[in-house]
Amino acid sequence: PNMTTVESTQCYAAALDFLAQRYSDPDMRIAHWIIHNEVDGGIHWTNMGDKPIATFMDTYLRSMRMCYNIVHQYDQHSEVFISFSHGWNIAAGGGWYKVRDMLDLMNQFSKAEGDFFWSLACHSYPAQLGNPCTWDDAQATFSMDTEYVTLKNLEVLDKWVGISQNQYKGNIRRSVWLSEAGTCSPSYEDKDLQDQAAGFAYGWKKINALDGINGIQWHSWFDHLGDGVPLGLRKYSDEEYKGEAKPVWTTY
């Protein structure tokens, strides 16, 4: 959003207030507010253009803090999340930022201006989207300097939120949701379908064992042509495949 004028800022605040008020009922509630999409790819997903990372994060933090303050008027238990791709210490796309640098700035800015409870929404796809065997991700290591964070090395996120300097007020762990994740089946051949299920099972065992990872949301219910790779739990919902369940459906 444009946070540089009073009018545009008030319009954004009004939209947030409308949503927060409408969806704060026990029967119809937004509990998790993910602020924008894959902000490390802000040059593609927002309207700011190619900006220095500090300029981008200053605007982003104001957007997130505004959402936090407004929704907490209606629901003290709601959470706001910074959304990022599977890049960590590498720009995951042309003109993108490094996620670790963005999180460092989040810490610096929020503590300087007053800390608040923001959380992490990670898109922990395999480093190569077309390869469901995430354990083969050579660029995903267990070092805090790893290039990518995927289902292979979720321990990096778990360790990051366990460090006191990254915690809310120094002692409260921030939430981590894998808010858009999944493995693909490169084809509908049996081996590819089994590899997709195995890739998820591999990741799930890690999620289940790591206290710092709260949960996972799968990318897509069905395969979709617009995704580039078949990431669904079920096959294409066309006349040929009719949304037939893939092995990963049962695993999930």
Task: For every predicted segment, state its role.
Residues 18, 39, 102, 131, ...:
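A generic structural signal for solvent-exposed, polar alpha-helical segments
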Residues 5-20:
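Glycine-rich anion/phosphate-binding loops
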Residues 5, 83, 182, 231-234:
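Glycine-centered flexibility motif
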Residues 22-25, 163:
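Glycine-rich, acidic and aromatic/proline-enriched surface loops and short helix-turn segments
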Residues 1, 11, 25-29, 34, ...:
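Aromatic-rich peripheral "rim/lid" segments of glycoside hydrolase catalytic domains that contact
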Residues 22, 70, 206:
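Short alpha-helical functional segments enriched in proximate histidine and acidic residues
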Residues 9-13, 29-31, 55-190:
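Noncatalytic carbohydrate-binding groove/subsite architecture in carbohydrate-active enzymes
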Residues 46-47, 134:
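Outer-membrane beta-barrel translocator domains and adjoining extracellular loop/strand segments
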